[in-house]
Amino acid sequence: MDKATVYYFVGIKGSGMSSLALILHDKGYQVEGSDIEQYTFTQKGLAAAGIKMLPFSEDNIREGLTVIAGNSFTDDHPEIKKAREMGLPVYRYHEFLGKLMEGFTSIGVAGTHGKTSTTGLLSHVLSHIAPTSYLIGDGTGKGTPDARFFVFEADEYRRHFVAYHPDYAIMTNVDFDHPDYYKDLADVQSAFQQFGNQVKKGIFAWGDDESLRHLDVDTPIYYYGTNDRDDFQAVNIKRTTKGSSFEVKYHDESLGKFEIPLFGEHNVLNSTAVIAVSYFEKVNLDEIRRELLDFSGVKRRFSEHQVGDMVMIDDYAHHPSEIKATLDAARQKYPDKEILAVFQPHTFSRTKALMDGFAASLSKADHVFLTNIFSSAREKSGDVSSKDLAAKLPNGGEIITTDDMSALTAYHNAVAVFMGAGDIQKYEKIYEDQMK
């Protein structure tokens, strides 16, 4: 690491990129970067830190920069191309992160779903007990001087996580996703196998996931879950409108009762994983208990507020399993209210590949509203539409647009759960303005 260079992020508003930029800034390095001019929720933290954000332009590239390129951008991007032509050091995000974690007790959180929530929970618990640096996929990052732990989100997309060799890994689940890259579930499984082989001290894996049960690695694997065969077992689970409580057993030893102000079974599982890895690092159980009780969640994961007589929940869910978990959490907290699912399908390839799963998960809501499919930078069009998904829903689904939300605004004293990984917040803003 070089204090003389300026670390320049191409795509600085990306969720992982903004987190990494904040870590380097906290550690006293010079940081700036470029991105689209449209506002994204990650830039709030960058602006608060005084980090310069520029529009994309090859004129930004100059001598003295070390370029960190976001994974969404190809080598043909004008800034990356110019940096290479000038002979500047250029790293991909995952390559640089792999270098950064050396010298800490590193804990990577991997899984098709639940990465960000679990990384956020683990970061919260450890950082209030011991010096901890962390990188969360919601745009939050912190670089702590003399940190003992480095907690980070390990993304399976395009096998980026194989750049990492952490001490520990939490693996929340393995599911088929990213159909623009992975061929099938077996392809995803092979990526997790490859990552698992690089973990040094221990893997903490969800025991109900058959793919994780079949991991074949030399590193010890400790399973967590709610069954007797799990090494770390959550028992006596109680779910109320205030949160969840449970006891954790490690084999025959009770680690005591824990309470979380969180909803949905997935949060009990995520918490059990956090307790397990912390226990192995000999973190005091009473301190873990205290910090779990104080966790308020991460950005865009079941973020809620009131608008008139409506409860609005904003969530990043964009896969059938995530939608199911989010709606389950909404039912736990609001058992007596109607649940309205407002979903923006993310990419044509994912919508087509997981169509039946989306229909099954969305049907857990009382009413479903769909926006048009959000296209990514890599994929502008496809042969499927939101109307195809609406037709698969047992009770149908209504298509809403930014110009016409009348079908949604007709509801009152209910819970509107907005879900998606694209620009669903644009719809939320319009809805909110109309409901005020």
Curated annotation (Swiss-Prot):
Q: Which InterPro entries match?
A: Mur-like_cat_sf, Mur_ligase_C, Mur_ligase_C_dom_sf, Mur_ligase_cen, Mur_ligase_N, MurCDEF_pg_biosynth, UDP-N-AcMur_Ala_ligase_MurC
One Pfam assignment? Mur_ligase_C
Q: What is its main location?
A: cytoplasm
Q: Which GO terms describe its molecular function?
A: ATP binding; UDP-N-acetylmuramate-L-alanine ligase activity
Question: Cellular component GO terms, alphabetically?
Answer: cytoplasm
**Keywords of this entry:** ATP-binding, Cell cycle, Cell division, Cell shape, Cell wall biogenesis/degradation, Cytoplasm, Ligase, Nucleotide-binding, Peptidoglycan synthesis
Intrachain S-S bonds: none
- Gene Ontology process terms (BP): cell division; cell wall organization; peptidoglycan biosynthetic process; regulation of cell shape
Localization (cell): Cytoplasm
Q: In which pathway does it act?
A: Cell wall biogenesis; peptidoglycan biosynthesis
* Binding sites annotated in the UniProt record for ATP: G111, T112, H113, G114, K115, T116, S117
Its Enzyme Commission number(s) read 6.3.2.8
Q: Which reaction does it catalyse?
A: UDP-N-acetyl-alpha-D-muramate + L-alanine + ATP = UDP-N-acetyl-alpha-D-muramoyl-L-alanine + ADP + phosphate + H(+)
User: Which PANTHER family does the entry link to?
Assistant: UDP-N-ACETYLMURAMATE--L-ALANINE LIGASE, UDP-N-ACETYLMURAMATE--L-ALANINE LIGASE-RELATED
What function is annotated for this protein? Cell wall formation.
State the family named in the UniProt similarity comment for this chain. Answer: Belongs to the MurCDEF family.
Q: This chain belongs to which protein, by name?
A: UDP-N-acetylmuramate--L-alanine ligase
Native species: Lactiplantibacillus plantarum (strain ATCC BAA-793 / NCIMB 8826 / WCFS1)
Phylogenetic lineage: Bacteria, Bacillati, Bacillota, Bacilli, Lactobacillales
